[in-house]
Amino acid sequence: MDDDDVEVGPGRAIPTDYIPVNLVPAKNGEIIKLGLITCRVLEDGSRTDNRIGAAEFTLPPGLSGPPAHWHEMHDECFLTTQGVIRYHLPKADGTEDIIDAKEGDFVTVPVRAPHTFSNPTDQEVKFVNTFTPAHYINYFKLLGTYVKEGKPISPKEHLDAMSNYATLPVLRKKAEKK
């Protein structure tokens, strides 16, 4: 059967223009150095009308991630592809939940869910991070202009960049004095 033989109508094939599919081969993609972290951009939103963005991150052993934060306008998903990444999930009472996501584990962080991550191990960690909408990829591009390769990113540098992308720090409850 060729395309001229396809019936068009409800429940039938719908004609569409050709829309190219994008492949980012392994080891390709825009590389952003974020101090000690490497970010490889897989989708910047330019092919998805900014509906989704994706990047692969590589964290060295023992690295703490950004300050605990939450996003006002975008959801994130994380797929661990190498090692173990630790998610710190601050709670209003000052405690936190911990998730250790191993290779193959998938974590979803909805809008307004407080979180951060770290690599508590002595092994390199890799994960793929998606965000919807895709505009958040620009946070990493901006952060890359703030920091020098090989130096850790300061909390102030993280927070300055986050403030441009509807991302707010978590207010930590201080322990009560006795």
Show the residue positions of the predicted features:
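Short, conserved beta-strand element in jelly-roll/cupin
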Residues: E56-P61, W70-K91, T130
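Long, hydrophobic/aromatic N-terminal blocks
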Residues: D2-G45
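Short acidic-glycine-tyrosine-enriched beta hairpin
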Residues: P25, K91-R112
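A short glycine-rich, His/Asp/Glu-containing loop-to-beta-strand
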Residues: N28-A68, H74
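Double-stranded beta-helix
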Residues: T116-K178
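Short beta-strand His + acidic residue motifs that chelate non-heme Fe in jelly-roll/DSBH
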Residues: P67-A68, Y87-L89, V109, H115-T121, ...
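Tight coil/turn sites that cap or link beta-strands
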Residues: P60-L63, G104, R112, D122
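Hydrophobic small-molecule pocket/channel-lining residues, especially in calycin-type beta-barrels
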Residues: G45, L63-S64, H71, I85-R86, ...
